Amino acid sequence: MSAVLTPAGFTDYKVADISLADWGRKELIIAESEMPALMGLRRKYAASQPLKGAKILGCIHMTIQTGVLIETLTALGAEVRWSSCNIFSTQDQAAAAIAAAGIPVFAWKGETEEEYEWCIEQTILKDGKPWDANMVLDDGGDLTEILHKKYPQMLERIHGITEETTTGVHRLLDMLKAGTLKVPAINVNDAVTKSKNDNKYGCRHSLNDAIKRGTDHLLSGKQALVIGYGDVGKGSAQSLRQEGMIVKVSEIDPICAMQACMDGFELVSPYKNGINDGTESSVDAALLGKIDLIVTTTGNVNVCDAGMLKALKKRAVVCNIGHFDNEIDTAFMRKNWAWEEVKPQVHKIHRTGAGQFDPTNDDYLILLAEGRLVNLGNATGHPSRIMDGSFANQVLAQIFLFEQKFADLPAEKKAERLTVEVLPKKLDEEVALEMVKGFGGVVTQLTKQQAEYIGVTVEGPFKPDTYRY
C-alpha cells in the first residue's frame, strides 16, 4: 500500500487510522459507479456551482456512500465539516479517505458516547470557535438539537436543515410545534426516492446481511418477530422471509397491520390481547418463548421492553434497525443482567443476574450492536445503489434551501418560512429518473394528448401530492 498523505499542514480531523485512506479511496471509486443519480447531479451542476458559499455541518453515518455524498457537495462548491450520527456506523476506511482529501471529519467506529458528542462539537467548532456555518445536514436530529441548545447564536446564519430520518423528522416537528425551531427544514426522509428505497428496499438488503455476519446463524426455518410494519418494517420482514424464516409482525397502526396481513405475515402482539398494562403478566410469554429472533423497526421507545426480554426464548437474537438504542430496553439489561462480549457489537446477555455469570449457562440472549442500528453496527449498511436516491435528495434539498437564503430575510418574513416540508415532487422525480437511467431503464413519455387527459404536463410532476406510492 502506498503512503497516505493529507494536504500539507492539514490536521483538522480525527479518524481511527489515516493509513486506511487508500483502501477507502478504492471503495469510493467503486461506489461512484453504483450511484448514478448522485454522480449525475455532480456532472449536471458542476459548472453552475450552486453550493458555492455554502458551509455545511454534516452529521450522518460516515460510510463509503457518505463519502460520495460529501465529495459531491464539495464538487458543487460547498465547504463541509463532518461527523457520524451513530457510534458504531463509521467505516474507518471511508473516514480516512475523506480526511486524506483534506476534508474535516471526526468519526471512527466504536466511539463512546462522550467521544460521539466530542466529534459533533469538533464539526461545530473550528480552531476552538464556532464555525460560520450556514447549512445543516443531519440524521436523527442530534446535531440540530446541540445547535439549538448550546450554540443558538449560530442559527442566525443558517439557511436551513435537511433531515435524513424518521426519528429526526419527528424531533423537528416537535420543535416546530413547540415554537423552538429557529430555521426551516426539508424532510428528506419522506421523499419517495428515500423512504421507498432506503427504508424499505435498503433494509430488505441489509438486515439479514447484518444478522448473518454477527451470528453466523442459519435463519431458515426459525421464527422471527418484526416489531413495526412501516417502510423499515416492511423491508425487514421481506429480508427475513427471503432467508426462509417464519415471520410474524407486531403493529399498533391498523392500516400497517392490514398491510402485514395482506402481505401474508401473521399479525401478533407480544402482549395478551394486544394490551400492555405495564405488568409482566400482560406479556404473551407463550408467543415470545418460541421466537428465535426479534427486530425492532419503529423509531419509538421500549417497543421491546423488559418483560418481553425476560420472556424471549433462550439464545434468541435481539436487534434494532429503527434508530436509537432505546427501542430495546438496553438500560434494563445493563442494570440487571451480565454482558459478555463475544466480538465487537455482539454480546451474550446472561439473564441470570448482574455481575458474574456462568459461561456454561444457556439462558442468554444474543444482542447485536448494543441495540443500535444493526445493519451499520454488524455490517456496512445499505448498498450504494440504495443510498444513491437518499443522498441525491440530500444534495437537491441542500441546494433548494441554500438558494432560499432564509438567514438573509428580514425578521418579519422569517416566521412564515419556518416550516418542515418534503422535497418538491418534481425534484423527487428528477432523482428517480436518474436512478432508472442507472439501471438502463427507459421511461415512456406521455403524449400531449395523454398529459392533458389526466391533467398533468408532459414534463411532470405526474402524481398529486396526496398519491401514495
UniProtKB/Swiss-Prot annotation:
Query: Which pathway does it operate in?
Result: Amino-acid biosynthesis; L-homocysteine biosynthesis; L-homocysteine from S-adenosyl-L-homocysteine: step 1/1
Provide the alphabetized UniProt keywords.
Cytoplasm, Hydrolase, NAD, One-carbon metabolism
Positions contributing to NAD(+) binding: 165-167, 199, 228-233, 251, 300, 321-323, 375
Sequence positions that bind substrate: 63, 139, 164, 194, 198
The UniProt entry, under Gene3D superfamilies, shows: Adenosylhomocysteinase-like (3.40.50.1480), NAD(P)-binding Rossmann-like Domain (3.40.50.720)
EC nos: 3.13.2.1
Enzyme class (EC, first level): hydrolase
An example of a GO molecular function for this protein is: adenosylhomocysteinase activity
Q: Which family does it belong to?
A: Belongs to the adenosylhomocysteinase family.
Catalysed reaction(s)? S-adenosyl-L-homocysteine + H2O = L-homocysteine + adenosine
List this protein's GO terms for biological process: L-homocysteine biosynthetic process; one-carbon metabolic process; S-adenosylmethionine cycle
Q: Does the keyword Cytoplasm apply?
A: yes
* Gene that produces this protein: ahcY
What domain of life is recorded for the organism?
Answer: Bacteria
Cofactor or coenzyme needed: NAD(+)
Q: What does this protein do?
A: May play a key role in the regulation of the intracellular concentration of adenosylhomocysteine.
Q: Explain how, and how many, cofactor molecules are bound.
A: Binds 1 NAD(+) per subunit.
Q: What is this protein called?
A: Adenosylhomocysteinase
Subcellular location per UniProt equals: Cytoplasm
Instruction: Give the InterPro entries listed for this entry.
Output: Adenosylhomocyst_ase-like_sf, Adenosylhomocysteinase-like, Ado_hCys_hydrolase_NAD-bd, NAD(P)-bd_dom_sf, S-Ado-L-homoCys_hydrolase_CS
Instruction: Report the source organism.
Output: Ectopseudomonas mendocina (strain ymp)
